[in-house]
């Protein structure tokens, strides 16, 4: 199973949704970076369940514990192990899923591949696996800020057909966190909340889009041809549960433009830096960061596990129906924001270290 990610800044996540706990081991973090459990906890609190009326009611504090790699608040350049204990499992809610597959969930494919699966909570296919990613992402964010001043802000761009109007150049974390749906558009956010609540009462679910911007990313990050920066960002974000699409810059909308309309014209700013007047490229050209803001969008499907009765089959192929009894998000988008931010941070941190290792000699 592919549970590791990265080259120089490398993470390996572990644990199942209803096991003893989940966590991450981080290898390659440089020494003497100041980091605390409180800084990691801040990010984990943004993704934890039970945080609002529009998220899963599963009650988990998701309290992190640093087991190794940090002494007196500073990293040692040794593996950093972080664990979060599971506290609020209700495995009996998954008894029907022992034999019946959830439509559009990983149950059937895990069985087909491995011949065995952790039924309760979905095991490694559960969003609880992302706890390790978000914890590692907190460290990557801190390293990026300290070394290069990079700032990463994600937010909910769209839920179903409700789309917020947000400027990625100016949006702030405070604006994002001012509403439980994490959409900083004050006009559309209440409508999103009402829609999620209504769909949740029906036992159904919703999908949408998270947009994320990384500001002040240094030029030169990315390794053509197969490790292009946008390719690694796409892989990282598409490895998150429930993802179904990825865009950078103009994305698919760029196919409706001509070259002269789409090209980002160069100019030299007052500081003598080469810039672009527009940013349809989304901060990369030729797979390498160009110094402009990196702007990506990630599409998340509606949550597969719903209370509505659905047609399915058992693991022996017999027709049956299934209505889930577990506690699940009616919409993953509000909790997905810190997950997307974490994956962007992990990719940028890894490429920053690779760039310094490869090109800092000259």
UniProtKB/Swiss-Prot annotation:
Coiled coil: none annotated. This is Chorismate synthase. FMN binds at residues 124-126, 286, 301-305, 327. It comes from Synechococcus sp. (strain ATCC 27144 / PCC 6301 / SAUG 1402/1). The keyword NADP applies. HAMAP family: Chorismate_synth (MF_00300). Belongs to the chorismate synthase family. One of its GO terms (cellular component) is cytosol. The gene is aroC. NADP(+) binds at residue 47. Its cofactor is FMNH2. The lineage of its organism: Bacteria, Bacillati, Cyanobacteriota, Cyanophyceae, Synechococcales.
């Amino acid at each position: 199973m592919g549970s590791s990610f990265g080259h120089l800044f490398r993470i390996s996540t572990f644990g199942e949704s209803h096991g003893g706990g989940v966590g991450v081991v981080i290898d390659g973090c440089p020494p003497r970076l100041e980091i605390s459990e409180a800084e990691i906890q801040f990010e984990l609190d943004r993704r934890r369940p039970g945080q609002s009326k529009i998220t899963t009611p599963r009650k988990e504090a998701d309290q992190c514990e640093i087991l190794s790699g940090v002494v007196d608040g500073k990293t040692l350049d040794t593996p950093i192990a972080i664990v979060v204990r599971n506290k609020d499992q209700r495995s009996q809610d998954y008894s029907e899923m022992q034999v019946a597959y959830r439509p559009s969930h990983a149950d059937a494919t895990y069985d087909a591949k491995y011949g065995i699966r952790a039924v309760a909570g979905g095991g490694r296919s559960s969003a609880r696996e992302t706890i390790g990613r978000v914890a590692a992402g907190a460290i990557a964010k801190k390293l990026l800020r300290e070394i290069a001043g990079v700032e990463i802000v994600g937010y909910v761009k769209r839920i179903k057909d409700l789309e917020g109007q947000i400027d990625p150049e100016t949006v702030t974390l405070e604006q994002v966190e001012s509403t439980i749906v994490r959409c900083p558009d004050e006009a559309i956010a209440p409508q999103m909340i009402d829609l999620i609540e209504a769909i949740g009462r029906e036992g159904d679910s919703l999908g949408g889009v998270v947009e994320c911007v990384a500001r002040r990313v240094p030029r030169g990050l990315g390794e053509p041809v197969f490790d292009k920066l946008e390719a690694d960002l796409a892989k990282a974000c598409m490895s998150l549960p429930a993802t179904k699409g990825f865009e950078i810059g103009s994305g698919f909308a760029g196919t409706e433009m001509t070259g002269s309309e789409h090209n980002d014209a160069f100019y030299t700013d007052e500081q003598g830096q080469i810039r672009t007047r527009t940013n349809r490229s989304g901060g990369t050209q030729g797979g390498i960061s160009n110094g402009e803001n990196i702007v990506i969008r990630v599409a998340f499907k509606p949550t597969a596990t719903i209370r509505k009765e659905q047609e399915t089959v058992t693991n022996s192929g017999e027709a049956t129906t299934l209505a889930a009894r577990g506690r699940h998000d009616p919409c993953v988008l509000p909790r997905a924001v810190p997950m997307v931010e974490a994956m962007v941070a992990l990719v940028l941190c890894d490429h920053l270290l690779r760039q310094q290792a490869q090109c800092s000699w000259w």
